[in-house]
């Protein structure tokens, strides 16, 4: 009983003061969507490096998991693996539209990601009949004008006498814009195959984007969910939406 009482006291104490970088929105505000959008923009500078006092991770750079690509039949096959990918630019998102339903704790955002720069390590293997070409090195690139739909669904959890908002895993869907990709040291720096392969990759960049988009969507969804729940777990529902 005593540990529970201590925990409730600590939670109440932590939730006592909302910091100035979190803008509180009134539930009955006829422009509550605009208020929430302004609140997100106010919080943006803190998103970049994180909020240590709330145990919120930073959004820059965004780390992606392994990306694997395999295309073609056995006699003309391309396989590639990309690791250690870091993405910069997610914090520069633009909120184009928000529809909220506070009674259902649902928020639907339409975002624009103007520019995402990424860098990582790649390993590539190409088999064309009896010819086998291999390479490994650095991969860099830029994605521009990515449209992003984010769906947030939450529920209230009661702790002691207070209610807190917790979100289910976010749903993130990206729509591809423009892209450019560059691989270094292709085929041990071959002066002919290297540039030619980079041209082919960029001419067929949709193939690569089909593989990276689900990984990017999941990474963004996991990060946004964690950030939101870290914040809402520190303040009661009534404090955030009086």
Which role does the model predict for each range below?
Residues 1-17:
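Cleavable N-terminal signal peptides of Sec/SRP-targeted secreted and luminal proteins
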Residues 15-23, 222-242:
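C-terminal helix/juxtamembrane-tail motif
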Residues 17-177:
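Hydrophobic-cavity lipid-handling domains and compact docking modules
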Residues 40-47, 51, 55, 201-205, ...:
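Sec/Tat-exported extracytoplasmic proteins
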Residues 61, 65, 136, 215, ...:
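Residue-level signal for alpha-helical context at structural boundaries
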Residues 126-127, 184, 226-228:
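Short, charged/polar low-complexity linear motifs in solvent-exposed/disordered segments
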Residues 151-163, 191-193, 212-215, 225, ...:
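Noncatalytic linker/hinge segments flanking ATPase motor cores
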Residues 163-217:
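Extended amphipathic ligand-handling, pore-lining, and cofactor/metal-binding catalytic surfaces
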